[in-house]
């Protein structure tokens, strides 16, 4: 699975692993420590977002 998220800079980011939820901050935290807003989860074999293929 792949995860689409929006980072603090407003950029869409694709993650291979799930961001973790930090209950103290009430936020999703990405692998690199940035707070993100999760937008979707996708099967790795069919990567599309808003009907457009996602390039990795």
Regions found by a protein language model. Give the residues of each.
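A short beta-strand micro-motif
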Residues: 2-7
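Low-complexity intrinsically disordered segments
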Residues: 25-56
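Short, surface-exposed terminal/edge motifs of secreted or surface/virion proteins that either
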Residues: 11-23, 40
